[in-house]
């Protein structure tokens, strides 16, 4: 989605209904890139003989998903920097990472997935609004979302800095 959206944005206006639709589709599927991190919780049920293999396999999938997710996020970040202030772009990316973190919670603990936006929007909206309107009833929502937000945010800062360091190396 990210490469498709990026290519489209170079030739078309982002503010059209097509641009908004493509951006919403990208945003809808972005949390899937990071979700696999939460599969680490299944390693505790793995037999001792397979734990190294399972860990290596899971981390390789997680690495690829995270990297692809951050590439897409970086593309979007660069486009935002062309259109809005630097501070607003950073805040917008932070909000996207917060939404991704909340989506990971929804998928891992409430078992919602991307397609439920289409096949069961009322049920999804109920669960989301219930947790947003009554956060004290669902402390796991806050702690899980915050944990993933800190993890995803700090990892993205490293990726952002790494891209800029490598860019500076090429200029030298």
Where are these regions (language model features)?
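Interfacial helix-loop-helix junctions of multi-pass membrane proteins
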Residues: 40-41, 106-120
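Alpha-helical transmembrane segments and their immediate interhelical/interface regions
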Residues: 49-82
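Hydrophobic alpha-helical membrane-insertion segments
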Residues: 24-31, 93-111
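Transmembrane alpha-helical segments in integral membrane proteins
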Residues: 67-80, 146-169
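Short, membrane-exposed interhelical loops at transmembrane-helix boundaries
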Residues: 116-139
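Hydrophobic alpha-helical transmembrane segments
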Residues: 58-69, 131-154
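Transmembrane alpha-helix boundary signature
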Residues: 4-9, 33-44
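Membrane-interface helix-boundary motifs at transmembrane edges
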Residues: 6-18, 78-88
């Amino acid at each position: 989605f990210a490469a498709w959206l990026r290519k489209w944005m170079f030739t078309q206006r982002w503010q059209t209904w097509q641009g908004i639709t493509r951006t919403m589709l990208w945003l809808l599927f972005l949390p899937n890139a990071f979700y696999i991190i939460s599969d680490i919780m299944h390693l505790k049920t793995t037999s001792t003989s397979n734990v190294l293999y399972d860990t290596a396999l899971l981390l390789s999938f997680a690495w690829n998903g995270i990297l692809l997710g951050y590439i897409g996020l970086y593309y979007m970040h660069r486009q935002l920097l062309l259109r809005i202030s630097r501070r607003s772009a950073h805040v917008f990316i932070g909000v996207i990472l917060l939404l991704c973190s909340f989506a990971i919670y929804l998928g891992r603990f409430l078992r919602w997935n991307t397609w439920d936006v289409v096949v069961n929007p009322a049920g999804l909206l109920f669960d989301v609004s219930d947790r947003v309107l009554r956060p004290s009833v669902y402390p796991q929502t806050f702690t899980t979302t915050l944990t993933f937000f800190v993890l995803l945010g700090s990892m993205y800062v490293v990726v952002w800095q790494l891209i800029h360091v490598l860019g500076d190396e090429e200029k030298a």
